[in-house]
Every structure is written in C-alpha cells, then in structure tokens.
Amino acid sequence: MKHFLRALKRCSVAVATVAIAVVGLQPVTASAAPNPVVGGTRAAQGEFPFMVRLSMGCGGALYAQDIVLTAAHCVSGSGNNTSITATGGVVDLQSSSAVKVRSTKVLQAPGYNGTGKDWALIKLAQPINQPTLKIATTTAYNQGTFTVAGWGANREGGSQQRYLLKANVPFVSDAACRSAYGNELVANEEICAGYPDTGGVDTCQGDSGGPMFRKDNADEWIQVGIVSWGYGCARPGYPGVYTEVSTFASAIASAARTL
C-alpha cells in the first residue's frame, strides 16, 4: 500500500499497497474521492515482465527470479512465511497464463518502525521465469522522469485493478517534497515524484511495494524507488513518496544472500 496517513501508506488491505491514479485535478476532501480515471494507460503484456502482484494487496518486483523486493509496510515481520502468493508473468491477473508461487520466507528491513527503511524481501518456493529488475546502487538515476506501474486503485478510494496500469511521474526535489510533508519526509531514505503543482497522476492504494523505475545509460530498466506513501492519491500539493533504493542497495543485497 501507499501510506495515506503516515500520510497514508498505500495499501489495499490491512498492510499497504498502491495503484496508479490518474484523476481529476480538483482538490479532494477527506470525505470525497476524486473523479474517476481520466488518463493513464494499460501496460502491454511483457512490457514490464519483472512486475509481481502479492496476495496481501501489494506490488513488488523480481529482485531475483525467486526473490521479490517490496515494501516493509506490506509484511508483518521477518521469518518463515508461506501465506503470501506472488503472481507474475501477466498483466491480466485473471489470465490462465499467470504464474502463482507461494512464499517461504520474509525479511523485513532491520529496524523498520513505520518511518523510513520501507523495504522487504520475499523468498519464493520456486522461481518465476521472468526477467528481473536491477536496482540502483548510486543516486545517479534519482532524477528525470520515472515509470510507475501497479494493479492498485485507479482513483482514491477505488477498487483494485485486474489489468496492470502504468504512468510516468517526474522527480520532485527534497525541498519541494518537504514543503508538502514537513518532518514526515525522511529525505536521506526517501525520494519523491509526481505533480505537486497540479496533482492528477500518482500511485494509490494497492500499489505499495511496487517499483518506480527508469532507463539507465545502457537503455535498461533500473529500479530507483519502492512505492511507500503519500497524502491521498494524486492530490495537488502532495507528490508520492518512495523508498530510495540506492540508499539501501547494499543492505538489500546482503539480505538477499541470506534467503
């Protein structure tokens, strides 16, 4: 989920997730959802083969074919865990071609307490035979325009989606993001993206844990963020907040070696 209130984590159920929201540009009150989707596009089959849907209502990406990188707020701790089902290989969650694999272990970021450090790894019982998504190890790619994708809600308060949706969101500076969230932003662990002036494009409930990514210098996808939280979905003045993957790249690699 994406946080709604940390400002909220972007979850679809008890733990968080986020979805692509492309909504009307008017302000939203706590009691009123924005207009239905007015933009955004459905991803093509095979366009983002590393995308994974998790049964608790979050997204994720294949760090390895048998390890999913997601958000810490999507899981309830570390240890053996066979309760999560990962679905991969499709954009249509109802497709007969969907690959469904159970989890065996979960590793939540050490020291996670609800603020910052919002990453986790899920070990799968068997590999999902799809390309993986490499992660950024430096801040060199923490700029420009990013892609986000997910099966989460397409409007604030909306339902989860059958088909994978995608959108582009531009980098938002720490200063601009801090003007929206103040001390809630952990600037050395988080990266912001979106349209703070107008709103209208964002991740939303059900996309939490999914990747924010862009092309690297070799024209290959590289993950720079993990969907974490934001105030509502696509509201003017409030960009999305993502775990800054490069900050935790070494810790993620070390943790993966233990699974």
UniProtKB/Swiss-Prot annotation:
Write the signal peptide boundaries.
1-32
SUPFAM superfamilies per the UniProt record, alphabetical: Trypsin-like serine proteases
Task: Enumerate the SMART domains for this protein.
Answer: Tryp_SPc
The UniProt keyword set, sorted, is:
Disulfide bond, Hydrolase, Protease, Serine protease, Signal, Zymogen
Q: Does the keyword Protease apply?
A: yes
The UniProt entry, under InterPro entries, shows:
Peptidase_S1_PA, Peptidase_S1_PA_chymotrypsin, Peptidase_S1A, Trypsin_dom, TRYPSIN_HIS, TRYPSIN_SER
Any one of the GO BP annotations? proteolysis
The EC number(s) attached to this protein equal 3.4.21.4
GO MF term list:
serine-type endopeptidase activity
Q: Where is the Peptidase S1 domain?
A: 37-257
Q: Where is this site: Required for specificity?
A: D202
**Prodomain positions:** 33-36
Disulfide pairings: C58-C74, C177-C192, C204-C233
Q: Which reaction does it catalyse?
A: Preferential cleavage: Arg-|-Xaa, Lys-|-Xaa
Which residues are catalytic?
H73, D118, S208
Q: What's this protein's family per the entry?
A: Belongs to the peptidase S1 family.
Quote the protein name from its UniProt record: Trypsin
